[in-house]
């Protein structure tokens, strides 16, 4: 595998970064805003930025954009994901003693919902330069997943987008830690 040649900067010579923060189901609002901007301005959000960075639920939106989806195409699956992954019965952890020692939400349900959207794409399949952070529990340090947009950034291209999505969204208490290439990663 050889990384794609470095893409030229957008017109104007500035390097434009779209940064998407987390917030669980609140990332649905972000996807709606991006979809509305595309509609109102008649632009492609993905094509308006050189790099997209996203953490936690914002990382899920970033990965969706990297998978070639428009913000409008992300909204509907994300709405379904919120209903499936965050059922009303689990929103009150103090009512379930087991949830004092285990994650509130089911990581397998999240993985299944993410697989429906991202399929078997790897980070190397991304149509955009992406940067998705996570926290390496063993090393006690940030772990940043990066597309191979530079000759020295070739480590992560084979990692499935779903695994990266699980790592960046593995918020302690809410979801179990993700295992990616032998590393235990959390949000």
Range-by-range predicted roles:
Residues 22-25, 137-139:
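Solvent-exposed loop/turn segments at secondary-structure junctions
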Residues 1-18:
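Flexible, membrane-associating and regulatory peripheral segments of lipid-active enzymes
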Residues 7-10, 41-46, 115-130:
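Surface-exposed acidic, glycine-flexible loop patches that form ligand/cofactor-binding
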Residues 37-41, 118, 169, 173:
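Structural motif corresponding to the C-terminal cap of alpha-helices
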Residues 15-19, 25-114, 149-154, 158-165:
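Patatin-like phospholipase
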Residues 103-117, 176-187:
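A broadly tuned preference for mixed-charge, low-complexity surface segments
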Residues 87, 93, 100, 125-186:
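Active-site gating loop/helix substructures
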């Amino acid at each position: 595998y050889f990384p794609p040649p470095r893409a030229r900067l957008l017109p104007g010579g500035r390097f434009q970064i779209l940064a998407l923060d987390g917030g669980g189901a609140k990332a649905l609002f972000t996807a709606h805003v991006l979809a509305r901007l595309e509609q109102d301005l008649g632009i492609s959000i993905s094509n308006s930025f050189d790099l997209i960075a996203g953490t936690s639920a914002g990382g899920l939106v970033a990965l969706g954009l990297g998978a070639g989806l428009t913000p409008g195409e992300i909204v509907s699956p994300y709405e379904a994901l919120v209903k499936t992954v965050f059922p009303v019965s689990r929103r009150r952890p103090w009512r379930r003693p087991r949830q004092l020692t285990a994650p509130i939400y089911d990581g397998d349900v999240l993985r299944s919902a993410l697989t429906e959207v991202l399929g078997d794409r790897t980070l190397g399949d991304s149509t955009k330069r992406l940067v998705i952070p996570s926290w390496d529990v063993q090393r006690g340090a940030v772990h940043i997943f990066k597309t191979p947009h530079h000759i020295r950034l070739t480590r992560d291209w084979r990692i499935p987008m779903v695994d990266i999505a699980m790592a960046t969204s593995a918020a302690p208490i809410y979801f179990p830690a993700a295992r990616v290439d032998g590393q235990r990663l959390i949000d």
